[in-house]
Amino acid sequence: MKILVQKFGGTSVGTLERIELCAKRVIKALEKGYKPVVVSSAMAGETDSLIELAKKVHPRPPEREMDTLLAVGEQKAIALFAMTLNKLGYPAVSLCGWQVPIITDNVHTKARIRKIGISRLLSLIEEGYIPVVAGFQGVTEDWEITTLGRGGSDTTAVALAAALKADCEINTDVPGVFTADPRIVPNAKKIKKISYEEMLELASLGAKVMQIRSVEFAAKYNVRIHVRSTFSEEEGTWIVPEDEVMEKVAVRGITVDTKETRFTVVRVPDKPGIAAEIFKALGDAHIVVDMIVQNVSHEGYTDMSFTVNKTDADKAEEIVKKIAQKIGAKEVVRDDKVAKISIVGIGMKSAYGVAGRMFDILARNGINIKAISTSEIKISCLIDEKYAELAVRALHEEFIEEMEEFETINGKNKE
């Protein structure tokens, strides 16, 4: 039995007409011999509307109640999707996370999937039904509803594909993964194949096509992912194991993330245990710290800077100010006007001079670097937000413009 997990994003299911378009794509997969399992996001704007509604009731709603509320968005979408398939003559059954079941840990609003029961899905498929599963949500061992965080429907889809030993098709409002955001770089190029490792870096660095945990799942369980447009029949981008990617280019893509906030703890006593105290408290609050910079010690004191996602900034500020007071630091300075620019490519493992070229390009454009972080296949620089788009365009021109193995945004090769 050849199963295909097909995930549809919020824009794809944003209207009843679009849901019918998505349903017809599912039927095409069925006609090609696949047994489809559908995963749907909430309709576009639905989650934001529910968040606004909650905040009218409570400025900081309890996370358990937020999960219960937000799960409604996907429940509405899957019911409409299943109704549409049934109307078109194809039996379908909608399933919430708890009905599958998708078992998660107990962390509300950012839950992680622990295991998935597939027996009910397989039974429905054998009986001739198309299962339509709610993305973004799960249930704890104690039957508490949880959500997986923004973009969690991608994670649901890839996790289901892993459990069912299937390929995964991500249907979205873009035609694939590009070398840069086409809204910033009009001649950005669609990537035909990209490795898990490269996609993981791009997702973690701000690329919005895939959610980071979904790529982690794919890499761990070897799930091949096809990212494509719901509104086009053209081939998208395949996310695959490294050995399937023929060309190991130095730079595969460039990302910008303006959803970062930088904190600087000024005049921190430079002694053992201080950094641990700050970052352990942030970790205990489930706040992910990204870039960290510590200045050279002067007269027994130092400055320590780090970045977090803007969604966690208020909570992080509250925590760090308390610790700063406790350890005798002078003050905590917050900067919301920063951006993280990154270049990613598996060929960077064996290429030389890439960092120097990147820093030179930024310098020639008058862009100052506030922090740097690197891995084997990426280099990230923190800069002022006002220079973000200029930096992306300049780096794209330097590293990618002349690469002929990519497809241009309009689908034509450079041959």
From Swiss-Prot:
Pathway: Amino-acid biosynthesis; L-lysine biosynthesis via DAP pathway; (S)-tetrahydrodipicolinate from L-aspartate: step 1/4; Amino-acid biosynthesis; L-methionine biosynthesis via de novo pathway; L-homoserine from L-aspartate: step 1/3; Amino-acid biosynthesis; L-threonine biosynthesis; L-threonine from L-aspartate: step 1/5
Gene Ontology CC, one term: cytosol
Enzyme Commission number(s) from the entry: 2.7.2.4
Keyword Kinase in record: yes
Catalytic activity: L-aspartate + ATP = 4-phospho-L-aspartate + ADP
GO biological process, one term: homoserine biosynthetic process
Domain ACT: residue ranges: 263-337, 343-415
Keyword ATP-binding: yes
EC class name: transferase
Gene3D superfamilies (alphabetical): Acetylglutamate kinase-like, VC0802-like
Entry superkingdom: Bacteria
One GO MF term attached to the UniProt entry: aspartate kinase activity
Family: Belongs to the aspartokinase family.
NCBIfam families: asp_kin_monofn, asp_kinases, PRK06635.1-2, PRK06635.1-4
Protein name according to UniProt: Aspartokinase
Gene: lysC
